[in-house]
């Protein structure tokens, strides 16, 4: 039986934030959620999240997770105290207990599996992950005696000689839960921090083993915004390197961010300052950017999107968008269409070969195939209470500065005169025009003030 305990009760004072530390995000997911995701890969029988500071916020953030049990630690008196509370609340202490911090978001499932394998193969009382750091400041030092761990000394309790040891405790443990439960309540806060340390159990258990892993960033704990930024950078480098090896070009890799869920096809060029968020999919031979933000959207083959934002929409094949366009949720731009500069599309569908080239707002609309929308066109979709739809049939030509007062339905091959305010439906092959006749008054003189 495998149980997991994730320590997430701390205040995270050094983050200087009103948000609990474990709820800060790396590439769109909270630190805690990333740790949970790694642990789920192990297929544990149960997962305990031990929380304390702003526990309701933490619990709400993971409310959709299955097999998660919340344990409240009050007051927060150290890692050992957290496990004491867990052991009191859980009656059966069977099998293995994996304990890790909620602020190590890059921990890999494969590393955790290696730890579990070592623990099982050696029938250990406790096994933990260690690594050697060039600068071990802030970490507990691990001291070995032969193949076994003799003791762990926390940074603030180290003397000068002990601080020279570069082998550190990564804060990831696998215990024989039965043996741990026999000694856990004997722990005391006899240290400079006046906290109950889980590390004190190491010297009390006979068969204590170390799994030393390379310091490659996955064990980085997050205590401040600098470390949060470093962790984000490590994550982003890993994501972008994967895409580059699969045929994606980044013009300025450091200025871009890509979500883990994003899919990018071969021969896509990602220009500078481009950000792909959420479940975004980019098909092959696209040029995305510069200065472009796409979230939870589909982009088809051979598209170009420049200096624009796209949210929760579908951009089909061979489409050009931008610069300075805003595609809002629930929009679909069909193949061979063009969205030009300073255009906003919202909850609308444009059929194939349609064009909205300049300075227009298209909201709650259906635009037919091969229709051209002139500069400055507005669909006035809101009457103060409700949104209404505009429908324009295929092969239509909409004059510049046309305003459609929805709800309205235009047939196929309709033309509107420039500057018209269209308030009535129009049939196929008609001209709709609504404007006053121009009057020129000769010899006009403006009044002088």
UniProtKB/Swiss-Prot annotation:
<dbReference type="InterPro" id="IPR025877">
    <property type="entry name" value="MobA-like_NTP_Trfase"/>
</dbReference>
<dbReference type="GO" id="GO:0016020">
    <property type="term" value="C:membrane"/>
</dbReference>
<feature type="binding site">
    <location>
        <position position="21"/>
    </location>
    <ligand>
        <name>UDP-N-acetyl-alpha-D-glucosamine</name>
    </ligand>
</feature>
<keyword id="KW-0961">Cell wall biogenesis/degradation</keyword>
<dbReference type="GO" id="GO:0019134">
    <property type="term" value="F:glucosamine-1-phosphate N-acetyltransferase activity"/>
</dbReference>
<comment type="pathway">
    <text>Nucleotide-sugar biosynthesis; UDP-N-acetyl-alpha-D-glucosamine biosynthesis; UDP-N-acetyl-alpha-D-glucosamine from N-acetyl-alpha-D-glucosamine 1-phosphate: step 1/1.</text>
</comment>
<keyword id="KW-0808">Transferase</keyword>
<dbReference type="InterPro" id="IPR001451">
    <property type="entry name" value="Hexapep"/>
</dbReference>
<feature type="binding site">
    <location>
        <position position="346"/>
    </location>
    <ligand>
        <name>UDP-N-acetyl-alpha-D-glucosamine</name>
    </ligand>
</feature>
<dbReference type="InterPro" id="IPR011004">
    <property type="entry name" value="Trimer_LpxA-like_sf"/>
</dbReference>
<dbReference type="InterPro" id="IPR029044">
    <property type="entry name" value="Nucleotide-diphossugar_trans"/>
</dbReference>
<feature type="binding site">
    <location>
        <position position="73"/>
    </location>
    <ligand>
        <name>UDP-N-acetyl-alpha-D-glucosamine</name>
    </ligand>
</feature>
<dbReference type="Pfam" id="PF14602">
    <property type="entry name" value="Hexapep_2"/>
</dbReference>
<feature type="region of interest" description="Linker">
    <location>
        <begin position="226"/>
        <end position="246"/>
    </location>
</feature>
<dbReference type="GO" id="GO:0008360">
    <property type="term" value="P:regulation of cell shape"/>
</dbReference>
<feature type="binding site">
    <location>
        <position position="418"/>
    </location>
    <ligand>
        <name>acetyl-CoA</name>
    </ligand>
</feature>
<dbReference type="Pfam" id="PF00132">
    <property type="entry name" value="Hexapep"/>
</dbReference>
<dbReference type="InterPro" id="IPR050065">
    <property type="entry name" value="GlmU-like"/>
</dbReference>
<comment type="similarity">
    <text>In the N-terminal section; belongs to the N-acetylglucosamine-1-phosphate uridyltransferase family.</text>
</comment>
<keyword id="KW-0963">Cytoplasm</keyword>
<feature type="region of interest" description="N-acetyltransferase">
    <location>
        <begin position="247"/>
        <end position="449"/>
    </location>
</feature>
<feature type="binding site">
    <location>
        <position position="375"/>
    </location>
    <ligand>
        <name>acetyl-CoA</name>
    </ligand>
</feature>
<feature type="binding site">
    <location>
        <position position="154"/>
    </location>
    <ligand>
        <name>UDP-N-acetyl-alpha-D-glucosamine</name>
    </ligand>
</feature>
<dbReference type="InterPro" id="IPR005882">
    <property type="entry name" value="Bifunctional_GlmU"/>
</dbReference>
<dbReference type="InterPro" id="IPR038009">
    <property type="entry name" value="GlmU_C_LbH"/>
</dbReference>
<feature type="binding site">
    <location>
        <position position="372"/>
    </location>
    <ligand>
        <name>UDP-N-acetyl-alpha-D-glucosamine</name>
    </ligand>
</feature>
<comment type="similarity">
    <text>In the C-terminal section; belongs to the transferase hexapeptide repeat family.</text>
</comment>
<feature type="binding site">
    <location>
        <begin position="78"/>
        <end position="79"/>
    </location>
    <ligand>
        <name>UDP-N-acetyl-alpha-D-glucosamine</name>
    </ligand>
</feature>
<dbReference type="GO" id="GO:0031470">
    <property type="term" value="C:carboxysome"/>
</dbReference>
<dbReference type="GO" id="GO:0006048">
    <property type="term" value="P:UDP-N-acetylglucosamine biosynthetic process"/>
</dbReference>
<feature type="binding site">
    <location>
        <position position="103"/>
    </location>
    <ligand>
        <name>Mg(2+)</name>
    </ligand>
</feature>
<keyword id="KW-0548">Nucleotidyltransferase</keyword>
<dbReference type="Pfam" id="PF12804">
    <property type="entry name" value="NTP_transf_3"/>
</dbReference>
<keyword id="KW-0479">Metal-binding</keyword>
<feature type="binding site">
    <location>
        <position position="140"/>
    </location>
    <ligand>
        <name>UDP-N-acetyl-alpha-D-glucosamine</name>
    </ligand>
</feature>
<keyword id="KW-0460">Magnesium</keyword>
<feature type="binding site">
    <location>
        <position position="169"/>
    </location>
    <ligand>
        <name>UDP-N-acetyl-alpha-D-glucosamine</name>
    </ligand>
</feature>
<feature type="active site" description="Proton acceptor">
    <location>
        <position position="358"/>
    </location>
</feature>
<feature type="binding site">
    <location>
        <begin position="7"/>
        <end position="10"/>
    </location>
    <ligand>
        <name>UDP-N-acetyl-alpha-D-glucosamine</name>
    </ligand>
</feature>
<dbReference type="GO" id="GO:0000902">
    <property type="term" value="P:cell morphogenesis"/>
</dbReference>
<keyword id="KW-0511">Multifunctional enzyme</keyword>
<feature type="binding site">
    <location>
        <position position="223"/>
    </location>
    <ligand>
        <name>Mg(2+)</name>
    </ligand>
</feature>
